[in-house]
Amino acid sequence: MNLLSQVIAFPGAEGFGKYTTGGRGGETYIVSNLNDSGVGSFREAVTQKTKRIIVFQVAGTIHLQTKLTILGDVTIAGQTAPGDGICIADQSVGLGGDNIIIRYLRFRLGDKFQRGDMINGNGGDDAFGGNRKKNIIIDHCSMSWSDDEVFSIYGGDSTTLQWNLIAEPLNYSYHYETGDKDFEKHGYGGIWGGKHLTAHHNLFAHCVSRNPRFNGARLGADEELVDFSNNVIYNWEHNSVYGGEGGKYNITNNYYRPGPSTNIKVQDRIVNPTKNEQRTFGRFYVNGNIVEGAKQVTQNNLLGVHMEGTSQDRINTIAAHPFEVINLPIENAAETFLKTIEKVGASFKRDTLDQRIIEDVIKRRGRIIDVQGGYPHGTPFDQTLTAWPTLKMENLLLDSDHDGIPNAWELLKGLDANNAKDAKYFTLSKEYSNLELYINSIVTDPKN
């Protein structure tokens, strides 16, 4: 099938991952409780090996007891949760397969299971992520409170990361590696990359570094092409965007806003290309970015490319023309800032934490934190439990046949509210199953 004739994942899907099919035409799995495991749990739904669409009949925070891996061929529709939505807490969540669509979920790890001794690997968990997977689109998710990176995804192919809020990794927490004299200060945003990855309208806030780090040709990856456009980076500390050994990158129309924690030496930094023993510097097309407080850099983005090496290295690193990608709608950095703070993250029902982060960005306040809730290092976990926002359950719609589509919507569209099989049929559209049409209709604004 010609690429241009394929069906996009959902209205508003953009970039290299936009043709991901997820669970289209598969079975319905309903998350009906907040249990760690068992019938009706989130874990049961995401670990099935069949094509499926996951919907929610519950709202609140799911406190995981062990790490969780999401198997492929799945669509997870967080926007279906009644009330204030869903948060996954306490353990890391990872992608364990290809062809995955995830929308409107929150991943807020915290340090409950990160606390331990100074042993290599302790405190090494991301809030959410996945490596070497293909056909992935992560849309309107909120991630925070990691011990390694908040959200890392690299080494795969055909990936889109859009409208995600990445904030408040735990800096002086319990991350320890061999040779350290103390737990590291490791409040990092994420490692991003892949053969073809698009990242747009994401917000990084209060991350010390890796906003993101481009993986480059390392850690099992041979080549990398990333379109990093129309994102917002706020209050980085000692590095903003960096890395990218041996890869190709468009860095265009992003908005950089230094904050209270930003080191004066990197306030005007757009990107810091690096090299290693195996690969030299990548190639970067840098244009259209706004750096607040650095008028000259905004006018000439190349002044914001900070790198070591020779003058010839710099000439080789800076590309005169953008690399060929699946183009995004044209939007300048100023427009990006306004749209992103309005709609980024799990914004269908934005929780109080995301509201605070957005207010931090607008008012240029906030700081790097060490413990969820902003408590000092070493605070007993039980004293931090109120850091997780309360997510209320409300307005559960009647669904007689338990197919994920409420009776009222089925009757409105001429479907059978007592036939569970019609959710996976393509009665109303040749492109999307009946259930997909319903879950997409919930977020009528594709940028919601």
Language-model features: locations:
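Acidic glycine-/aspartate-rich tracts in secreted/extracellular proteins
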Residues: N35-D36, A59-T61, T80-G83, G259-T262, ...
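Extracellular beta-strand/beta-solenoid scaffold signature
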Residues: I88-V93, R115-G129, W145-I153, Y174-G194, ...
